[in-house]
Amino acid sequence: MRDAIKRCRQNQDGAVRGPFVSVQDVCKSYGLGEGKAQVLKDLSLEVAQGELCAILGASGSGKSTLLNVVGGLDEVDSGRICVGGCDVTALGPSQLLEYRRDFLGFVFQFYNLVPNLTVRENIQVTSYLSANPLDMQELIETLGLSAHADKFPSQLSGGQQQRCAIARALVKKPQLLLCDEPTGALDSATSLEILGLLEQVNRSFGTTMLIVTHNEGITAMCDQVVRIKDGSVVSSVGNAHKLSASEIEL
């Protein structure tokens, strides 16, 4: 297990051979006996390094569960998940903590900002988790937070709070950013603004991203669109260029 973490560290600043994220025949169930429900059913997908991948599907299709198992927040019943050359399914509890701390960033629907810290301080606290964080001022400027850096979360709009949450996730230079419905609590105009910001971050910093969303507006921004139904991938479309309208109508 220690070797798996070591391989992650060796790959942190270099290209990874093959897919950066590889999910192979993953199954995941919840409950026991007659109440047992299979949420992921032999699900497989691959995401290249630096790619922005959208995960679309109806509520209950398994999208959030997929992020949870890729992020090491939940165990699989069977199958294998590799991220950056690291076999996540082979990691023990302490190694999973290292994996989440050192290699992943998380952005959720609700921002979970520390209310008595300013925007700058919220970001700074997370930067301490990395030995080589991004330049905080550059990140604040890139995410359009310069005018709000010394404000508290209660003084921000929903979109501004989500920008702060994204900056906080990015400052420690994660290899993989996992976003679970990052625009779910926002109005349609702000949602498109945040999705465009995630695309900008992806292009600027080369961060590999998995974004779970109901928002079809993201599809034109993505390198790959994966659609999930009843716990399985029903379609996956993508290439080296942004997707055209005809490509995303599946």
Language model region names:
Residues 19-21, 26-228:
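ABC family nucleotide-binding domain
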Residues 225-238:
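H-loop (His-switch) and adjacent beta-strand-loop-beta switch element
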Residues 132, 218, 234, 242-243:
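Flexible, glycine-rich phosphate/dinucleotide-binding loops
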Residues 1-29, 235, 239-250:
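ABC-family P-loop ATPase nucleotide-binding domain
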